[in-house]
Regions:
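ATP-binding N-terminal substructure of ATP-dependent carboxylate-amine bond-forming enzymes
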Residues: 1-50, 54, 69
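Residue-level signature of catalytic and energy-coupling elements of molecular machines
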Residues: 11, 131, 193
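Active-site flanking residues adjacent to catalytic metal/cofactor-binding acidic residues
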Residues: 13, 84, 120, 192, ...
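Short glycine-rich anion-binding loops that position phosphate/pyrophosphate groups of nucleotides
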Residues: 16-18, 88-89, 134, 209
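Short amphipathic alpha-helical segments
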Residues: 23-26, 133, 218
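Active-site nucleotide/adenylate-binding loops and adjacent lid/helix of ATP-dependent enzymes
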Residues: 41-183
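A short, polar/charged loop-to-alpha-helix boundary motif
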Residues: 154-157, 213-219
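Conserved metal-phosphate-binding beta-hairpin within the catalytic cores
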Residues: 185-215
């Protein structure tokens, strides 16, 4: 890592499933964008939701789950249907189990294979959109028009641009993304997934990269 850092001027990364310990070594040698804090938050679902709700943004109701007792309490508080997810390394529907009734709890917990998990309540939404936004070292923020996402079997199938949004929803989505970028003192490109609901926009997740819903931006 030291040899690599000394051979370059700036360091970046293309996805979030890398150890933050590597950045601990590298950041002492070269600038890293996006920064370590952004990586640490985005790769842990609990840390991510704590950060987002700390900004006053809305997420799905959630609770940390480390065992059967935690899960029972979380279900009692959040209700069903809900979804149990590993806090780390889950993507494209992996590391997830639906809990339609409390009777599904034991099976869902077993599917986590002992990993720390988070229970998330189901959200009633009309559609999902994502904002691909970038922030420069000078603090300026720019964003592409939000795209509308359709998933099949937990995997992104299509992204259509522009998304079906009212002018105010479109503005709110971009401003929300900018708020996240600024709070992280972020430099680079980020994908922000949002649920469009009758009560407003709900943040699903953030990604410290050009999210797969933003691959169209290369064209």
């Amino acid at each position: 890592l030291t040899a690599f850092a000394k051979a370059v001027d700036v360091i970046t990364y293309e996805f979030e499933n890398i150890p933050t310990s590597a950045l601990d070594v590298l950041e002492a040698l070269r600038p890293i964008h996006p920064n370590r804090r952004a990586l640490g938050i985005s790769q842990d679902r609990i840390a991510e939701k704590d950060f987002l709700t700390g900004l006053g943004l809305t997420t799905a109701p959630y609770a940390r789950v480390t065992g059967a007792e935690d899960l029972a309490g979380a279900i009692a508080g959040i209700g069903t249907p809900a979804i149990l997810k590993t806090t780390r390394l889950g993507y494209d529907g992996k590391g997830q189990a639906r809990i339609m009734t409390p009777d599904d709890a034991a099976t869902a917990l077993a599917a986590m294979n002992g990993a720390e998990a988070v229970l998330e309540g189901f959200i009633t939404f009309s559609h999902e959109v994502s904002v691909i936004a970038a922030r420069g070292q000078d603090g300026s923020v720019s964003a592409y028009d939000p795209g509308e996402n359709v998933h099949r079997a937990g995997i992104l199938h299509t992204t259509t641009v522009p998304a079906k949004l009212t002018p105010s929803q479109r503005t709110d989505a971009v401003l929300l993304a900018a708020r996240i970028l600024n709070a992280l003192d972020y430099v680079g490109v980020m994908g922000v997934e949002l649920f469009v609901t009758a009560k407003g926009l709900i943040v699903n997740e953030i990604a410290p990269r050009v999210h797969n819903s933003g691959h169209w931006t290369q064209n």
